[in-house]
Amino acid sequence: MAHPKRKTSKTRRDKRRTHYKATVAQIATCPITGEAHLYHRAYWHEGKMYYRGQVVIDKSEAVA
């Protein structure tokens, strides 16, 4: 197996890690509810779950 001949310095290690960074999440605003949410994710608003502008689950109604 390969192993390093020399210890990697803190500077070299940190320079390499500058490219490892988190991206900023894109946030959408629903045209129906006006709620801010992540793209491609369902979200709750006033007891209803919305996805792509449509109600998917409605918890406000009683299930008989």
Curated annotation (Swiss-Prot):
Keywords tagged on the record: Ribonucleoprotein, Ribosomal protein
Classify the source by domain of life.
Answer: Bacteria
GO MF annotation: an example: structural constituent of ribosome
Q: Which GO terms describe its biological process?
A: translation
Q: Name one GO cellular component term.
A: large ribosomal subunit
Q: Mind telling me which Pfam families this protein's record contains? A: Ribosomal_L32p
Q: Does the keyword Ribonucleoprotein apply?
A: yes
Any keyword Membrane?
A: no
Family indicated by similarity: Belongs to the bacterial ribosomal protein bL32 family.
Q: What is this protein called?
A: Large ribosomal subunit protein bL32
Q: Which organism is it from?
A: Flavobacterium johnsoniae (strain ATCC 17061 / DSM 2064 / JCM 8514 / BCRC 14874 / CCUG 350202 / NBRC 14942 / NCIMB 11054 / UW101) (Cytophaga johnsonae)
